[in-house]
UniProtKB/Swiss-Prot annotation:
Region span, Disordered: 1-22, 41-85
Protein name per UniProt: Uncharacterized protein 042L
Chain intervals with Polar residues compositional bias: 75-85
Superkingdom assignment: Viruses
Source species taxonomy: Viruses, Varidnaviria, Bamfordvirae, Nucleocytoviricota, Megaviricetes
Length: 85
C-alpha cells in the first residue's frame, strides 16, 4: 500500500492555512447579516419616490429607431417594445 511522505500528510483536525491574507474586519463579524436584495429593494423604492416614473432609455429608443432590415421579418411590428411597457 502506498503511504504519502510525512511532509505531505496533514492531520484532519489541522485548520486550513490562510493563503489569501484576507481577514474579515471585526465590525463586519459582529453585525447581523443584511440581505442585499432587501437593501436593493429599499434603494429602488427611494429612487422611484424621488424621480417621476419614466419608461426608460431603452423604451424610447425602441419606439424611435426602426429595426434593421434583416430583423424586420423576424419580429412583427407589434412585438417591438412590447416587453418594455
Amino acid at each position: 500500500m502506498f503511504a504519502p511522505p510525512s511532509s505531505l500528510f496533514v492531520p484532519a483536525t489541522a485548520p486550513a492555512p490562510s493563503t489569501s491574507g484576507f481577514t474579515i474586519p471585526a465590525n463586519l463579524r459582529r453585525d447581523a447579516y443584511v440581505c442585499p436584495f432587501a437593501t436593493a429593494e429599499k434603494e429602488r423604492k427611494e429612487r422611484e419616490q424621488q424621480q417621476p416614473a419614466s419608461k426608460g432609455l431603452n423604451h424610447d429608443l425602441a419606439a424611435q429607431e426602426p429595426l434593421h432590415p434583416s430583423l424586420v421579418s423576424r419580429f412583427p411590428s407589434n412585438y417591438r417594445g412590447s416587453f418594455l411597457r
